[in-house]
Regions:
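Intrinsically disordered, low-complexity terminal regions
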Residues: 1-385, 391-397
Length: 397
Protein backbone atom coordinates (compact mmCIF):
# COMPACT_ATOMS: atom_id res chain seq x y z
CA UNK A 1 0.00 0.00 0.00
CA UNK A 2 1.43 3.33 -1.08
CA UNK A 3 1.02 6.35 1.18
CA UNK A 4 1.32 9.81 -0.30
CA UNK A 5 2.52 12.61 2.00
CA UNK A 6 1.51 16.13 1.04
CA UNK A 7 3.80 18.85 2.34
CA UNK A 8 2.17 22.27 2.68
CA UNK A 9 4.20 25.45 2.43
CA UNK A 10 4.11 27.99 5.30
CA UNK A 11 2.17 30.41 3.09
CA UNK A 12 -0.56 27.82 2.47
CA UNK A 13 -0.77 27.02 6.18
CA UNK A 14 -1.10 30.73 7.05
CA UNK A 15 -3.85 31.16 4.46
CA UNK A 16 -5.71 28.18 5.94
CA UNK A 17 -5.50 29.59 9.48
CA UNK A 18 -6.73 33.02 8.36
CA UNK A 19 -9.64 31.38 6.54
CA UNK A 20 -10.68 29.55 9.70
CA UNK A 21 -10.52 32.80 11.69
CA UNK A 22 -12.70 34.59 9.13
CA UNK A 23 -15.25 31.77 9.15
CA UNK A 24 -15.35 31.94 12.95
CA UNK A 25 -15.93 35.69 12.84
CA UNK A 26 -18.72 35.26 10.29
CA UNK A 27 -20.40 32.63 12.44
CA UNK A 28 -20.25 34.85 15.53
CA UNK A 29 -22.96 37.55 15.68
CA UNK A 30 -21.60 41.03 15.05
CA UNK A 31 -21.72 43.48 17.96
CA UNK A 32 -24.24 46.27 17.54
CA UNK A 33 -23.77 49.71 19.10
CA UNK A 34 -26.33 52.35 20.00
CA UNK A 35 -25.43 55.81 21.32
CA UNK A 36 -27.03 58.95 22.65
CA UNK A 37 -25.76 62.24 24.02
CA UNK A 38 -27.32 64.60 26.54
CA UNK A 39 -26.14 68.20 26.99
CA UNK A 40 -27.38 70.84 29.41
CA UNK A 41 -26.04 74.08 30.88
CA UNK A 42 -26.97 76.02 34.02
CA UNK A 43 -25.95 79.41 35.32
CA UNK A 44 -24.32 79.34 38.77
CA UNK A 45 -23.15 81.87 41.31
CA UNK A 46 -21.05 81.89 44.47
CA UNK A 47 -22.54 79.52 47.04
CA UNK A 48 -24.08 77.15 44.48
CA UNK A 49 -23.19 73.45 44.40
CA UNK A 50 -22.94 70.67 41.81
CA UNK A 51 -24.15 67.13 42.55
CA UNK A 52 -23.46 64.21 40.20
CA UNK A 53 -24.32 60.51 40.58
CA UNK A 54 -23.19 58.06 37.92
CA UNK A 55 -22.50 54.37 37.28
CA UNK A 56 -20.63 52.37 34.65
CA UNK A 57 -18.42 55.11 33.28
CA UNK A 58 -16.28 58.08 34.21
CA UNK A 59 -16.77 61.60 35.51
CA UNK A 60 -14.29 64.06 34.01
CA UNK A 61 -14.23 67.65 35.24
CA UNK A 62 -12.52 70.63 33.63
CA UNK A 63 -12.55 74.29 34.65
CA UNK A 64 -13.37 77.41 32.70
CA UNK A 65 -13.83 81.11 33.49
CA UNK A 66 -17.60 81.19 33.06
CA UNK A 67 -20.37 81.29 35.65
CA UNK A 68 -21.93 78.26 34.01
CA UNK A 69 -21.96 74.52 34.55
CA UNK A 70 -22.01 72.63 31.24
CA UNK A 71 -22.88 68.93 31.47
CA UNK A 72 -22.41 66.58 28.54
CA UNK A 73 -23.16 62.87 28.90
CA UNK A 74 -22.21 60.26 26.32
CA UNK A 75 -24.06 56.93 26.60
CA UNK A 76 -23.10 53.85 24.61
CA UNK A 77 -24.70 50.39 24.69
CA UNK A 78 -23.41 47.26 22.97
CA UNK A 79 -25.38 44.07 22.28
CA UNK A 80 -25.74 41.27 19.73
CA UNK A 81 -28.67 42.92 17.99
CA UNK A 82 -29.68 46.51 17.27
CA UNK A 83 -33.00 45.92 18.98
CA UNK A 84 -31.33 44.71 22.15
CA UNK A 85 -28.80 47.57 22.14
CA UNK A 86 -31.64 50.08 21.74
CA UNK A 87 -33.60 48.48 24.60
CA UNK A 88 -30.61 48.88 26.90
CA UNK A 89 -30.06 52.45 25.74
CA UNK A 90 -33.69 53.29 26.56
CA UNK A 91 -33.21 51.90 30.06
CA UNK A 92 -30.65 54.60 30.85
CA UNK A 93 -32.06 57.95 31.92
CA UNK A 94 -30.00 61.07 32.66
CA UNK A 95 -31.85 63.67 34.71
CA UNK A 96 -30.34 67.14 35.03
CA UNK A 97 -31.92 70.06 36.85
CA UNK A 98 -31.32 73.08 39.04
CA UNK A 99 -33.34 73.68 42.18
CA UNK A 100 -32.31 76.67 44.22
CA UNK A 101 -28.52 76.69 44.33
CA UNK A 102 -28.14 72.98 43.54
CA UNK A 103 -27.29 71.78 40.04
CA UNK A 104 -27.76 68.01 39.84
CA UNK A 105 -27.18 65.29 37.27
CA UNK A 106 -28.23 61.73 38.09
CA UNK A 107 -27.93 58.48 36.14
CA UNK A 108 -30.89 56.11 36.53
CA UNK A 109 -30.91 52.61 35.05
CA UNK A 110 -34.24 50.81 34.90
CA UNK A 111 -34.31 47.19 36.01
CA UNK A 112 -33.57 44.60 33.37
CA UNK A 113 -36.55 42.41 32.46
CA UNK A 114 -34.52 39.79 30.56
CA UNK A 115 -31.80 38.11 32.62
CA UNK A 116 -29.89 36.99 29.51
CA UNK A 117 -27.39 39.82 29.20
CA UNK A 118 -24.32 37.98 27.87
CA UNK A 119 -22.02 40.01 25.61
CA UNK A 120 -23.80 43.23 26.51
CA UNK A 121 -22.27 46.37 27.99
CA UNK A 122 -23.00 50.00 28.70
CA UNK A 123 -20.76 53.01 29.18
CA UNK A 124 -21.94 56.33 30.64
CA UNK A 125 -19.36 59.11 30.61
CA UNK A 126 -19.89 62.57 32.10
CA UNK A 127 -17.91 65.58 30.85
CA UNK A 128 -18.40 68.62 33.06
CA UNK A 129 -17.13 72.17 32.68
CA UNK A 130 -17.52 74.38 35.73
CA UNK A 131 -15.98 77.38 37.54
CA UNK A 132 -12.87 76.50 39.60
CA UNK A 133 -14.38 77.60 42.93
CA UNK A 134 -17.71 75.80 42.60
CA UNK A 135 -18.39 73.26 45.36
CA UNK A 136 -19.19 69.75 44.14
CA UNK A 137 -20.47 66.35 45.30
CA UNK A 138 -19.31 63.63 42.91
CA UNK A 139 -20.44 60.02 43.25
CA UNK A 140 -19.11 57.41 40.81
CA UNK A 141 -19.59 53.64 40.96
CA UNK A 142 -17.84 51.26 38.53
CA UNK A 143 -15.70 53.96 36.97
CA UNK A 144 -13.19 56.73 37.52
CA UNK A 145 -13.29 60.35 38.62
CA UNK A 146 -10.83 62.68 36.90
CA UNK A 147 -10.34 66.19 38.29
CA UNK A 148 -8.22 69.18 37.18
CA UNK A 149 -4.81 70.13 38.55
CA UNK A 150 -6.30 72.72 40.94
CA UNK A 151 -9.65 72.46 42.73
CA UNK A 152 -10.65 75.54 44.72
CA UNK A 153 -14.16 74.65 45.90
CA UNK A 154 -15.26 72.35 48.70
CA UNK A 155 -15.34 68.80 47.36
CA UNK A 156 -17.22 65.68 48.50
CA UNK A 157 -16.04 62.71 46.45
CA UNK A 158 -17.20 59.08 46.49
CA UNK A 159 -15.69 56.53 44.12
CA UNK A 160 -16.25 52.76 44.30
CA UNK A 161 -14.76 50.14 42.00
CA UNK A 162 -12.74 52.83 40.26
CA UNK A 163 -9.92 55.33 40.59
CA UNK A 164 -9.61 58.97 41.61
CA UNK A 165 -7.09 61.10 39.74
CA UNK A 166 -6.90 64.67 40.98
CA UNK A 167 -4.57 67.58 41.50
CA UNK A 168 -4.53 70.03 44.39
CA UNK A 169 -7.39 70.87 46.76
CA UNK A 170 -7.21 74.35 48.27
CA UNK A 171 -10.53 74.05 50.16
CA UNK A 172 -12.05 71.32 52.32
CA UNK A 173 -12.22 67.86 50.79
CA UNK A 174 -13.98 64.65 51.82
CA UNK A 175 -12.88 61.58 49.85
CA UNK A 176 -14.36 58.09 50.09
CA UNK A 177 -12.62 55.47 47.95
CA UNK A 178 -13.34 51.74 47.88
CA UNK A 179 -11.85 49.01 45.66
CA UNK A 180 -9.61 51.21 43.54
CA UNK A 181 -6.68 53.62 43.62
CA UNK A 182 -6.35 57.33 44.31
CA UNK A 183 -3.69 59.87 43.45
CA UNK A 184 -3.98 63.49 44.55
CA UNK A 185 -1.69 66.47 44.85
CA UNK A 186 -1.76 68.87 47.78
CA UNK A 187 -4.53 68.88 50.39
CA UNK A 188 -5.41 71.55 52.93
CA UNK A 189 -8.11 70.19 55.26
CA UNK A 190 -9.29 66.74 54.20
CA UNK A 191 -10.98 63.58 55.42
CA UNK A 192 -10.33 60.24 53.73
CA UNK A 193 -12.29 57.00 54.09
CA UNK A 194 -10.38 54.21 52.35
CA UNK A 195 -11.30 50.56 51.90
CA UNK A 196 -9.42 48.01 49.78
CA UNK A 197 -7.47 50.77 48.06
CA UNK A 198 -4.47 49.31 46.29
CA UNK A 199 -2.49 52.55 46.23
CA UNK A 200 -3.37 55.92 47.76
CA UNK A 201 -0.79 58.56 46.90
CA UNK A 202 -0.87 62.01 48.49
CA UNK A 203 1.76 64.60 47.74
CA UNK A 204 1.48 67.13 50.59
CA UNK A 205 -1.17 67.93 53.19
CA UNK A 206 -1.79 70.42 55.96
CA UNK A 207 -4.43 68.67 58.09
CA UNK A 208 -5.62 65.12 57.37
CA UNK A 209 -8.01 62.67 58.99
CA UNK A 210 -7.86 59.14 57.54
CA UNK A 211 -9.78 55.93 58.22
CA UNK A 212 -8.05 53.18 56.25
CA UNK A 213 -8.86 49.47 56.00
CA UNK A 214 -7.08 46.97 53.75
CA UNK A 215 -5.35 49.84 51.97
CA UNK A 216 -1.85 51.13 51.23
CA UNK A 217 -0.90 54.79 51.60
CA UNK A 218 2.09 56.78 50.42
CA UNK A 219 2.31 60.38 51.70
CA UNK A 220 5.18 62.74 50.96
CA UNK A 221 4.84 65.57 53.48
CA UNK A 222 2.14 66.36 56.03
CA UNK A 223 1.80 68.74 58.94
CA UNK A 224 -0.91 67.06 61.03
CA UNK A 225 -2.40 63.58 60.65
CA UNK A 226 -5.08 61.76 62.62
CA UNK A 227 -5.42 58.22 61.40
CA UNK A 228 -6.74 54.74 62.06
CA UNK A 229 -5.25 52.05 59.85
CA UNK A 230 -6.12 48.35 59.78
CA UNK A 231 -4.67 45.61 57.57
CA UNK A 232 -2.58 47.88 55.39
CA UNK A 233 0.69 49.70 54.84
CA UNK A 234 1.65 53.32 55.45
CA UNK A 235 4.68 55.23 54.20
CA UNK A 236 5.25 58.89 55.12
CA UNK A 237 8.35 60.79 54.05
CA UNK A 238 7.96 63.69 56.48
CA UNK A 239 5.39 64.61 59.15
CA UNK A 240 5.14 67.07 62.02
CA UNK A 241 2.37 65.67 64.24
CA UNK A 242 0.73 62.24 64.30
CA UNK A 243 -2.17 60.79 66.29
CA UNK A 244 -2.81 57.18 65.27
CA UNK A 245 -4.21 53.72 65.81
CA UNK A 246 -2.28 51.03 63.94
CA UNK A 247 -3.70 47.51 63.78
CA UNK A 248 -2.36 44.56 61.78
CA UNK A 249 -0.31 46.94 59.63
CA UNK A 250 3.19 48.16 58.84
CA UNK A 251 3.99 51.88 59.07
CA UNK A 252 7.21 53.63 58.05
CA UNK A 253 7.97 57.28 58.76
CA UNK A 254 10.96 59.00 57.20
CA UNK A 255 11.21 62.12 59.37
CA UNK A 256 9.08 62.90 62.43
CA UNK A 257 9.52 66.56 63.33
CA UNK A 258 7.42 67.10 66.44
CA UNK A 259 5.00 64.72 68.18
CA UNK A 260 3.63 61.20 67.90
CA UNK A 261 0.80 59.57 69.82
CA UNK A 262 -0.18 55.98 69.03
CA UNK A 263 -3.08 54.89 71.22
CA UNK A 264 -2.86 51.31 69.92
CA UNK A 265 0.00 49.58 68.10
CA UNK A 266 -1.65 46.18 67.73
CA UNK A 267 0.07 43.30 65.94
CA UNK A 268 1.89 45.93 63.89
CA UNK A 269 5.29 47.44 63.21
CA UNK A 270 6.13 51.14 63.33
CA UNK A 271 9.51 52.40 62.17
CA UNK A 272 10.70 56.02 62.46
CA UNK A 273 13.93 56.44 60.54
CA UNK A 274 14.74 59.98 61.64
CA UNK A 275 13.22 61.53 64.77
CA UNK A 276 14.09 65.22 64.95
CA UNK A 277 16.28 66.20 67.94
CA UNK A 278 13.75 68.97 68.62
CA UNK A 279 10.79 66.56 68.96
CA UNK A 280 8.32 67.26 71.77
CA UNK A 281 7.02 63.77 72.62
CA UNK A 282 6.55 60.18 71.47
CA UNK A 283 3.86 58.11 73.19
CA UNK A 284 3.11 54.57 72.00
CA UNK A 285 0.92 51.91 73.59
CA UNK A 286 1.67 48.48 72.20
CA UNK A 287 -0.46 45.37 71.99
CA UNK A 288 1.91 42.83 70.45
CA UNK A 289 3.40 45.67 68.39
CA UNK A 290 6.98 46.74 67.71
CA UNK A 291 8.43 50.26 67.64
CA UNK A 292 11.80 51.21 66.15
CA UNK A 293 13.09 54.79 66.41
CA UNK A 294 16.32 56.37 65.17
CA UNK A 295 17.54 59.89 66.04
CA UNK A 296 20.84 61.81 66.18
CA UNK A 297 23.31 60.48 68.75
CA UNK A 298 23.80 63.85 70.47
CA UNK A 299 20.09 64.39 71.14
CA UNK A 300 19.24 65.00 74.79
CA UNK A 301 16.09 63.04 75.75
CA UNK A 302 14.62 60.35 77.97
CA UNK A 303 13.22 56.85 77.34
CA UNK A 304 10.55 55.26 79.52
CA UNK A 305 9.52 51.69 78.69
CA UNK A 306 6.92 50.09 80.94
CA UNK A 307 5.40 46.60 81.31
CA UNK A 308 8.15 44.88 79.31
CA UNK A 309 7.92 41.46 81.00
CA UNK A 310 8.19 39.35 77.85
CA UNK A 311 9.51 42.18 75.68
CA UNK A 312 12.85 43.55 74.58
CA UNK A 313 14.10 47.09 75.12
CA UNK A 314 17.15 47.79 72.97
CA UNK A 315 18.91 51.17 73.27
CA UNK A 316 22.26 51.62 71.53
CA UNK A 317 24.61 54.16 70.04
CA UNK A 318 23.99 56.89 72.67
CA UNK A 319 25.73 58.36 75.69
CA UNK A 320 23.51 56.90 78.43
CA UNK A 321 24.00 59.13 81.47
CA UNK A 322 21.48 57.31 83.65
CA UNK A 323 19.74 53.95 83.46
CA UNK A 324 17.16 52.54 85.84
CA UNK A 325 15.66 49.06 85.70
CA UNK A 326 12.66 48.23 87.87
CA UNK A 327 11.49 44.61 87.98
CA UNK A 328 9.03 44.95 90.84
CA UNK A 329 6.01 42.70 90.37
CA UNK A 330 7.98 41.36 87.42
CA UNK A 331 6.66 44.10 85.13
CA UNK A 332 10.16 45.12 84.01
CA UNK A 333 10.19 48.90 83.62
CA UNK A 334 13.12 50.75 82.03
CA UNK A 335 14.19 54.39 82.25
CA UNK A 336 17.08 55.88 80.27
CA UNK A 337 18.45 59.40 80.31
CA UNK A 338 20.38 60.14 77.15
CA UNK A 339 22.97 62.91 77.13
CA UNK A 340 21.68 64.10 80.50
CA UNK A 341 18.17 64.64 79.17
CA UNK A 342 14.99 64.48 81.24
CA UNK A 343 12.72 65.85 78.50
CA UNK A 344 11.44 65.25 75.88
CA UNK A 345 10.43 61.62 76.38
CA UNK A 346 9.92 58.54 74.28
CA UNK A 347 7.27 56.68 76.29
CA UNK A 348 6.52 53.08 75.34
CA UNK A 349 3.86 50.94 77.02
CA UNK A 350 4.79 47.38 76.12
CA UNK A 351 1.88 45.55 77.74
CA UNK A 352 4.30 42.64 78.24
CA UNK A 353 4.66 41.66 74.58
CA UNK A 354 5.66 44.80 72.66
CA UNK A 355 9.27 45.42 71.64
CA UNK A 356 11.14 48.75 71.59
CA UNK A 357 14.33 49.64 69.75
CA UNK A 358 15.92 53.10 69.94
CA UNK A 359 19.17 53.66 68.06
CA UNK A 360 21.47 56.49 67.05
CA UNK A 361 21.57 57.52 63.43
CA UNK A 362 24.87 57.18 61.64
CA UNK A 363 26.78 60.37 60.94
CA UNK A 364 27.29 61.69 57.43
CA UNK A 365 30.91 60.55 57.43
CA UNK A 366 30.00 57.04 58.52
CA UNK A 367 27.40 56.72 55.78
CA UNK A 368 30.09 57.11 53.11
CA UNK A 369 28.04 58.88 50.43
CA UNK A 370 29.34 61.35 47.91
CA UNK A 371 29.95 64.80 49.49
CA UNK A 372 28.51 66.59 46.44
CA UNK A 373 24.94 65.81 47.57
CA UNK A 374 23.00 68.52 49.38
CA UNK A 375 22.95 67.91 53.17
CA UNK A 376 19.18 67.81 53.58
CA UNK A 377 18.68 65.44 50.67
CA UNK A 378 21.66 63.42 51.79
CA UNK A 379 20.33 62.91 55.32
CA UNK A 380 16.93 61.93 53.96
CA UNK A 381 18.53 59.27 51.77
CA UNK A 382 20.56 57.95 54.70
CA UNK A 383 17.85 57.87 57.30
CA UNK A 384 14.54 57.89 55.46
CA UNK A 385 15.52 55.18 53.01
CA UNK A 386 15.38 55.00 49.26
CA UNK A 387 11.96 53.32 49.38
CA UNK A 388 10.47 56.57 50.65
CA UNK A 389 11.85 58.52 47.72
CA UNK A 390 10.42 56.27 45.04
CA UNK A 391 6.92 55.31 44.08
CA UNK A 392 5.68 51.98 45.36
CA UNK A 393 2.95 49.95 43.75
CA UNK A 394 0.75 47.62 45.78
CA UNK A 395 -1.59 44.91 44.67
CA UNK A 396 -5.12 44.76 46.12
CA UNK A 397 -5.42 41.66 48.27
Amino acid sequence: MNTTHVKLSPAVLLTFVLLLCNLSAIARPQEKIKKKEISQSYSVSAGDRLQVENRYGNITVTHWNQNTVAIRVEVECKARSEERAQENLDRIQIETKKIGGIVSAVTTIKKEMNSNSNNESMTINYYIQMPPKLAADLNQKYGNINLPSDNNGNMDIHVKYGNLNAGNFTANAMIEAKYGNIEVGNLQDAQLDLGYVGTAKIRNAKDLTIDSKYSNLDIQDIQSLRMEIKYGNLTIESVSRLDMEIKYSDAKIGTLKDALNVSSLSYSNLKIRNLSPSFSKVNVESHYGNLEVALPAKTSFRIVAENMKYSSCDVNGFNITRKHFDDEDRDKNYTYEINGGKQPTIHFEGNRYGNLKVKANKSVVEAGHAPSLQPDIFILRCFAGVSLLSSTSYRVV
